[in-house]
């Protein structure tokens, strides 16, 4: 093999909106409310290996806005990307898939969610940037904690 074939390789094959849903259970009455909504945002990242060097990474976002305990809207969206990643050492592959890929996808997710909110008749909500490295490190710490708890469980049982 030549040196070119062994060079680290990272390529975005495709970025796409995998799923999106919008619910407005209290419209049109909710449009008459004068109070500002409270907004909750949840984000998650999942990755699947599709082939030896091809990964699908999905950043999921859920935005719930409430006015006086009434749901104004609920948006769930999944922004996905297919990435071709080759000749990356195993110890660097997981952080690349868990940090770099979601960082690439999140602006698309944020834009799609903001567009859906305004098209639904609500004032724009702009999601803040997310530190995917901190999210990744937090997930690793949780996995290590779970592994440690499972290793300490008597008779091979796992703790929940």
From Swiss-Prot:
Protein name: Protein-export protein SecB
Coarse class of the protein's main subcellular location: cytoplasm
GO CC, any one term: cytoplasm
Function: One of the proteins required for the normal export of preproteins out of the cell cytoplasm. It is a molecular chaperone that binds to a subset of precursor proteins, maintaining them in a translocation-competent state. It also specifically binds to its receptor SecA.
Superkingdom classification of source: Bacteria
Protein transport listed as a keyword: yes
InterPro entries registered for this protein in UniProt: SecB, SecB-like_sf
């Amino acid at each position: 093999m030549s040196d070119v074939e062994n060079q680290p390789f990272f390529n975005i094959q495709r970025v796409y909106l995998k799923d999106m849903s919008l619910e407005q259970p209290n419209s049109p009455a909710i449009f008459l409310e004068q109070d500002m909504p409270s907004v909750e945002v949840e984000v998650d990242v999942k990755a699947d290996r599709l082939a030896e060097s091809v990964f699908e990474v999905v950043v999921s976002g859920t935005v719930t806005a409430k006015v006086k305990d009434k749901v104004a809207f609920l948006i769930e969206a999944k922004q996905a990307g297919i990435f071709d990643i080759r000749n990356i050492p195993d110890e660097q592959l997981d952080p690349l898939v868990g940090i770099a890929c979601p960082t690439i996808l999140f602006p698309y997710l944020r834009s799609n969610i903001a567009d859906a909110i305004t098209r639904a008749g609500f004032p724009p909500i702009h999601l803040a940037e997310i530190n995917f490295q901190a999210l990744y490190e937090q997930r690793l710490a949780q996995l290590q904690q779970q592994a440690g708890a499972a290793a300490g469980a008597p008779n091979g049982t796992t703790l929940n």
